């Protein structure tokens, strides 16, 4: 039995049941609301970090030294409010599926509840002064990708509370003459009060704990253990597994995990650069470039192989069009259009290859470099947007072996993703074919037409 047949017979039926669950669908559909904004932001990100010699100097000469900061304005405006958009979108989609509560009211209430979980203060330390707490501000990190997991939980919780209260008829109904928009607002009063009361209790409970706030609790529970495993092969494997799992749950795995192990990687990179400049053996394999350029071709999950199949082998028009949209980003190692476009978030079909592929690439790449078959990263800092093959050559200090390893890794990505891509593509093609079939019309008797 082929791999594809095995997947279609055993994996797909279970995946269909999971994927059809209301809450799973709502999370996926709600997060997709970010996609057009992130696509726009990704193009500006590419232009800000084009890996062309002399490009940065040219732009500085034309637009000034701060040109890149200004180019990143759209990136910050699109990427940094992901959790806000998702909190509204998930609740809206879940309310749509229940059909018993107003989706717009549910989305707005979820947004309010999510904002209420965020501490509205931040610690500010002047250059020549003492640290002080600034009140009345919302940290951008809390409403961006780092707050996405909290947004998912709160949006599902608030909508379920809203539905439960409304189903008990604990609502204020206005007379028939009141405009519908006003009537819906009053219907949301009591359910909304209950939602905020529960979320307030949750926030107070977490604030009474050593964590202080919900986002800090997640960062502490996940991040501190990762700090102790930074530069080892087992630690690297654990890191990419955790990153992948978090992404499939809708949480920005890189933003959470890398913030704790990046200091180790950057320190290794600095030591590698010193050794490279002095003509000494490179001491470390695992650095920031090792992860960015060999483990994540096409972005987190090594999605470049999947994008290639979508461009060249898709029978589904949806997959083919998404491949065309995601290809420029994948070429520059930006995976968000794929993660939120297919989507890979809460998608059991792609859970296994999304986790397995980076693990295999870590093992293969580490072994190749440890045995001397491939030159390790020389400590040369390259932006993560540097395209494959160019990056392999530059990061190793001009060794062809870096390119060869990237070819091998891309091949592994193609092999692992292929059966899952084929099964998903067949499913989407069948759905498109079914939706294209003419619907049977029902001819009513003359008496029923009046």
Indicate residue ranges for each PLM-predicted region.
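Early transmembrane hairpin of solute transport permeases
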Residues: 20-172, 345
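Membrane-interfacial segments
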Residues: 48-51, 55-56, 94-102, 165-174, ...
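Helix-loop-helix hairpins and the membrane-proximal interhelical loops
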Residues: 22, 30, 36, 46-72, ...
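Alpha-helical membrane segments and immediately flanking helix-loop junctions
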Residues: 84-94, 108, 112, 278-349, ...
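Hydrophobic core segments of alpha-helical transmembrane domains in multi-pass membrane transport
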Residues: 34-49, 85-93, 109-121, 150-163, ...
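Membrane-interface helix-loop-helix junctions at boundaries between adjacent transmembrane segments
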Residues: 103, 121-234
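Short, membrane-interfacial amphipathic segments enriched in basic
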Residues: 1-21, 60, 167-175, 210-215, ...
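Transmembrane alpha-helical segments and their short flanking loops
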Residues: 2-18, 53, 57-69, 273-282, ...
